[in-house]
């Protein structure tokens, strides 16, 4: 992404900018997020676990979407239709697929829904080995743990740090519970108060503000 300021009027218009809206997917270009391990935690097949998690991720716009796309080798026709979903702020996704309640997110999400079959925190630490645990539950049972390796992109890190220096807050739309302010500040080496996470109730407002329009004011071309 790039931008061009067209004249002094553009400088006047944007001089007081104090925040920037961005989708979390833009912070993690291809190769930033990889599947490090997959731990089955129930009798549910690995294929069903992958398809359920991939379906919910792809429908919601999760940063894990490209990771699952890679696992499916681009065969999106295999995905299940998602009947509905919501993002529980700071926790993860809750949706309905094939008349089954499917949760995808943090350990806290599972605990909040009293999901059975979670491994102990000691076991989780052993399985993840410093990476991120994303849990999948199907119909009230912990089905699998996806161990995710997240690496900061150098150019993204640089512009987030530059925005911080300019006093501009990056407001992030995400549906991934593990992307907390603390996680992002540690990952990109910025202060935690330089990023804010957009609550799910404002996601439709975000979409209306950032949707494509055929015409735009000439003060800035992006």
Regions found by a protein language model. Name each.
Residues 1-11, 69, 77-78, 199-205:
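Juxtamembrane coupling segments of multi-pass membrane pumps/enzymes
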């Amino acid at each position: 992404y790039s931008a061009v300021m067209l004249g002094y009027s553009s400088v006047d218009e944007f001089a007081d900018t104090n925040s920037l809206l961005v989708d979390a997917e833009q912070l993690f270009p291809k190769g930033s997020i990889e599947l490090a391990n997959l731990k089955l935690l129930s009798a549910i097949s690995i294929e069903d676990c992958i398809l359920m998690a991939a379906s919910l991720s792809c429908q919601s716009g999760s940063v894990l979407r490209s990771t699952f796309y890679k696992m499916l080798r681009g065969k999106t026709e295999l995905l299940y239709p998602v009947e509905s979903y919501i993002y529980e702020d700071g926790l993860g996704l809750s949706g309905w697929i094939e008349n089954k309640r499917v949760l995808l997110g943090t350990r806290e999400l599972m605990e909040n829904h009293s999901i059975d079959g979670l491994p102990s925190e000691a076991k989780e630490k052993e399985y993840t080995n410093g990476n991120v645990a994303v849990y999948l539950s199907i119909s009230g049972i912990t089905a699998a743990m996806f161990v995710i390796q997240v690496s900061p992109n150098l150019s993204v890190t640089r512009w987030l740090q530059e925005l911080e220096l300019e006093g501009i807050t990056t407001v992030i739309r995400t549906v991934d519970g593990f992307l907390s302010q603390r996680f992002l500040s540690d990952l990109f080496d910025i202060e935690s108060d330089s990023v804010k996470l957009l609550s799910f109730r404002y996601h439709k407002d975000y979409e209306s503000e950032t949707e494509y329009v055929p015409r735009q004011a000439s003060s800035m071309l992006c």
